[in-house]
From Swiss-Prot:
Taxonomic lineage from the root: Bacteria, Pseudomonadati, Pseudomonadota, Gammaproteobacteria, Methylococcales
Domain of life of the organism encoding this protein: Bacteria
Reaction(s) catalysed (UniProt annotation): 5-methyltetrahydropteroyltri-L-glutamate + L-homocysteine = tetrahydropteroyltri-L-glutamate + L-methionine
Originating gene: metE
Molecular function via GO: 5-methyltetrahydropteroyltriglutamate-homocysteine S-methyltransferase activity; zinc ion binding
Residues binding Zn(2+), per UniProt: 642, 644, 666, 727
UniProt cross-references to HAMAP family, sorted A to Z: Meth_synth
Ligand binding (L-methionine): 432-434, 485, 600
Catalytic residues of the enzyme: 695 (proton donor)
Cofactor binding, note field: Binds 1 zinc ion per subunit.
Species of the source: Methylococcus capsulatus (strain ATCC 33009 / NCIMB 11132 / Bath)
Function: Catalyzes the transfer of a methyl group from 5-methyltetrahydrofolate to homocysteine resulting in methionine formation.
The EC number(s) this enzyme carries: 2.1.1.14
Protein name, UniProt field: 5-methyltetrahydropteroyltriglutamate--homocysteine methyltransferase
Signal peptide feature range: none
């Protein structure tokens, strides 16, 4: 009989209880005790859901107040010394300061978790980094699960992944050198778990799906040989990509079990089944943990049956990865189109699907014949549904030519025309788009959605917010303004709601970072734009000022990456469909007199496949999608794009191929290190490195911002530098945003004065 288990479960709660509790604690409305109680209640609820669905081993340690990688840093006692915190006495408040910064120290860096829209807090390493006793949270949670008479399976980020995803804060050494110091800390954790009666521990090593240098690969076998002696049986878990090239040595390694992703890489199953050792278990991830479509149960059961014929009771069944990446429960969606709802499965439903596969494997197909027949019917209904197909969209794609994917003139010819039209000073200042979403703004949007605020009253409320944003920007002295995005609940959801082919949930929340949750739309069919989406708001903002106002759009790659995309056609085709819709909006904005249009692509890099061999194809269609969206404008219309949380060094040629006139990037948490790559590459167009971290409430001093600008000016031609925050200001409060922007504007003016003096001296 197969063992069923889960690699992780959504932690925020079906009603975003964790978000609300954390933010109440941050605001001082509640204390750590109340927050801790909410955490206990959520953990118990989620464990019981999983156990009630038939999961034999429930994950413990997948819960985190902010981030699971940050939890590992706290557990390992690897808290950066710059904060001055005692690792084994770390309070919740101090834990949050690591992620959010404080008056003395900026936050730890944050970046994307592989190719997902989840963000993790990056560990910091130097030669003196120590590992030792840390927080007790994991051990406490194990005891909580045992008290509920559950079978806990602790989940740890494995040591190689933990080190690899960290960052050196000191030149001249490799973080891999810390492995001999790190392994004893892991071994101590494993011994404690073993002493508490835990039989299995899941060790997540998703970096095995990447192209790793030889020294990193060679470190795995001896590392796990050492850890296997600590007591519990180790299940080494991989996901997001194939690890077939490592099958031979993984099967001979010291771990007691392996988990592989059979959704993203079903072909690798055969490599692992061949000569699979008799003393190990193999866990197959048969249910997609990354997307929301119902599983083809018949095909998944066939996979399980084939593996079971080889492995017998050594077969384990699981989702492909943690269910953190999907919403919690589809049953809460009472207003979703019933036909579309029938095609979907969220975390709870995915565990139910796993139970069907397990039952079919144990009792035979006849025991689940009704479930298989019903699923076959739903899959066929979806494939034939008229909701999916739009012949007009397909005709437009077929009619595209090379001219649709390029600007009229090269950047060197466009740039002077844009400068003349926009009349911007050196080191022009701007923001990334959104301004603080005040309770008043949110209340107006919510009332309008509920039908309690009519269209005229809603328009008046949004216009009032736009007026305030424009007034504040003019008062601060910003050069290129934005309208503030008061009307937008989310940069993807807002546009998706106005596009055909998208569906929306009421409760489909997933965690993005910390307390930040997003509700990704669902792309179920061909995408088209029925009518203009932003022209009214941008045009109104421009009517209030003589300064230029940027149009603000979300790019096609991000619209795809931050949605649950349809799985019945190539992602490249869906991206081009979205690009055509954005292209139409760009044309309408330009016709309305908008001189600068920003097409945000913060998710551009996150779509990059983990393996280099697969990347050229992705970059080809991703670049084409952006260019299709942006290249229909005149030379004197300035196209901006924004990217964040990214390591760009390996994709700079593709970023240059986007041919955006201005790119703004998030660089502050990495102290402008990213900009050096742009400088070394010789990035040809304008660039705006983020000069302060908007994810932290900390307000940087003007001198601090100027120091970053001076560092930027040493890496990139100052004539091509823009000055802007790291990202949008939606989650900040107005007082801190205004002070930070005032300091930013003053730093830009100081740079202009310095450049002017330098020019005079020359």
């Amino acid at each position: 009989m197969a063992v069923t288990h889960s690699l992780g479960f959504p932690r925020i709660g079906a009603g975003r209880e964790l978000k609300r509790a954390v933010e109440a604690c941050w605001a001082g409305r509640t204390g750590p005790a109340e927050l801790a109680q909410t955490g206990r209640e959520l953990r118990e609820r989620h464990w019981m859901i999983q156990s009630g669905s038939g999961i034999d081993l429930v994950p413990v340690g997948d819960f985190a107040w902010y981030d699971q990688m940050l939890n590992m840093t706290a557990l390992l006692g690897a808290v950066p010394r710059r904060f001055g915190f005692q690792a084994d006495a770390l309070s919740l408040d101090q834990y949050f300061q690591l992620a959010r910064g404080n008056a003395e120290q900026p936050a730890m860096e944050m970046t994307k978790w592989f190719d997902t829209n989840y963000h993790y807090i990056v560990p910091e390493f130097d030669r003196e980094t120590g590992f030792g006793p840390g927080t007790e949270w994991l051990f406490d949670e194990v005891e909580e699960a045992k008290a509920l008479r559950l079978n806990p399976k602790p989940v740890l980020i494995g040591p190689l992944t933990y080190l690899h995803l960290g960052k050196e804060r000191q030149a001249g050494f490799s973080r891999l050198e810390l492995l001999p110091r790190l392994l004893p800390a892991y071994a101590a954790i494993l011994r404690r778990l073993h002493a508490s009666g835990v039989p299995w521990v899941q060790m997540d090593e998703p970096i095995l799906g990447m192209d790793l240098p030889p020294e990193w690969l060679e470190a795995f076998a001896p590392a796990y040989a050492a850890l296997a002696e600590a007591g519990p049986k180790l299940l080494l878990a991989t996901y997001f990509a194939s690890v077939a090239e490592h099958a031979v040595w993984l099967k001979s390694s010291a771990v007691a079990g392996l988990h592989i992703d059979a959704v993203r890489a079903p072909e690798q199953v055969a490599d692992f089944l061949k000569d699979f050792p008799a003393d190990k278990v193999l866990s197959l991830g048969l249910i997609d943990g990354r997307n929301v479509w119902r599983t083809d149960l018949r095909r998944a059961l066939e996979q399980a049956e084939s593996a079971g014929a080889v492995l017998g009771e050594r077969l384990w069944l699981a989702p492909s990865c943690s269910l953190l990446h999907v919403p919690q429960d589809l049953s809460l969606e009472t207003s979703l189109n019933p036909e579309i709802k029938d095609w979907l499965a969220f975390a709870v439903q995915k565990l139910e699907e796993l139970a069907v596969i397990d039952k079919g494997l144990r009792l035979g197909r006849q025991a689940v014949a009704a479930e298989l027949a019903e699923r076959d019917r739903l899959l066929q209904t979806r494939a034939q549904s008229p909701l999916i197909h739009d012949p007009g969209v397909k005709r437009r794609l077929e009619g595209l030519s090379d001219a649709d994917f390029r600007r009229h003139s090269p950047f060197a010819e466009r740039s002077p025309l844009q400068r003349e039209r926009l009349r911007l000073p050196p080191f022009p200042t701007t923001t990334i788009g959104s301004f603080p979403q005040t309770p008043k703004i949110r209340a107006a949007r919510a009332a309008h959605r509920r039908g309690e605020l009519n269209g005229d009253a809603y328009r008046d409320a949004m216009r009032a917010a736009i007026r305030e944003a424009v007034y504040k920007q003019e008062s601060l002295g910003l050069d290129l303004l934005v309208h503030g995005e008061a009307e937008r609940n989310d940069m993807v959801e807002y546009f998706g709601e106005r596009l055909a082919g998208y569906a929306f949930t009421k409760h489909g929340w997933v965690q993005s970072y910390g307390s930040r949750c997003v509700k990704p739309p669902i792309i179920y069919g061909d995408v088209a734009r029925p009518e203009p989406m932003t022209v009214e708001w941008i045009g109104y903002a421009q009517s209030l000022t003589k300064k230029p106002v940027k149009g603000m759009l979300t790019g096609p790659v991000t619209m795809l990456q931050w949605s649950f995309a349809r799985d019945d056609q190539p992602r490249a085709v869906t991206a081009l469909q979205i690009a055509l819709a954005i292209r139409d909006e760009v044309a309408d904005l330009e016709a309305a007199g908008v001189a600068a249009i920003q097409i945000d692509e913060p998710a551009f890099r996150e779509g990059l496949p983990l393996k280099a061999a697969d990347r050229a194809d992705y970059l080809d269609w991703a670049v084409k999608a952006f260019r299709l969206a942006s290249c229909g404008v005149a030379d004197d219309t300035q196209i901006h794009t924004h990217m964040c949380y990214s390591e760009f060094g390996d994709i700079l040629p593709a970023i240059a191929e986007l041919d955006a006139d201005v790119i703004t990037i998030e660089t502050c948490r990495s102290a402008m290190d990213l900009l050096e790559a742009f400088g070394a590459f010789g990035y040809p167009n304008d660039i705006g490195p983020g000069v302060y971290d908007i994810h932290s409430p900390r307000v940087p001093a003007g001198a601090e911002i100027r120091a970053l600008l001076e560092k930027a000016a040493a890496a990139v031609d100052p004539e091509r530098l823009w000055v802007n925050p790291d990202c949008g200001l939606k989650t900040r409060q107005w007082p801190e945003a205004e002070q930070a922007l005032a300091n930013m504007v003053e730093a830009a003016r100081a740079m202009r004065r310095a450049e002017s003096l330098a020019g005079s001296a020359a």
